[in-house]
Amino acid sequence: MRHYEIVFIVHPDQSEQVPAMIDRYKSIVTARNGQIHRLEDWGRRQLAYPIQKVHKAHYVLMNIECDGEALGELEHAFKFNDAVLRHLTIKMKKAVTTPSPMMKEEKSRSLTPAAGDEGKPAEAAEA
């Protein structure tokens, strides 16, 4: 079995359906004795350029280990799902389980207060 990294972008109007989509795609991989090494839901983000007149989309990253049949079935599911705007599959040399740079950035943002937030309590105390 080979290792793959898959990123797919979902139409923002279908964001509520993303957990169900993830479950369906996970079941496709696991039904053929594949494994999911990393699954990250990056949420709604700005696109670099509009796709179908949409400027934001919901991003999901999956690192999987599966055979060619499971990958073909997964890509077939992406192609025939109108909510999936784009998908990209990259063959990897080994399984990747560490958090992606996008998740590390998100975590560091949540741990450090924003620059604009530091000045607000002082202004409120003066008033």
Swiss-Prot record:
**Gene3D superfamilies linked:** 3.30.70.60
Q: Name one GO cellular component term.
A: cytosolic small ribosomal subunit
Alphabetic keyword roster = Ribonucleoprotein, Ribosomal protein, RNA-binding, rRNA-binding
GO molecular function (one): structural constituent of ribosome
Q: Which GO terms describe its biological process?
A: translation
Q: Where is this region: Disordered?
A: 96-127
InterPro entries per UniProt: Ribosomal_bS6, Ribosomal_bS6_sf, Ribosomal_S6_plastid/chlpt, Transl_elong_EF1B/ribsomal_bS6
What the entry lists under NCBIfam families is as follows: S6
The entry's family comment says: Belongs to the bacterial ribosomal protein bS6 family.
Query: What this chain does, per the record?
Result: Binds together with bS18 to 16S ribosomal RNA.
Protein name, UniProt field: Small ribosomal subunit protein bS6
**Organism this protein belongs to:** Azoarcus sp. (strain BH72)
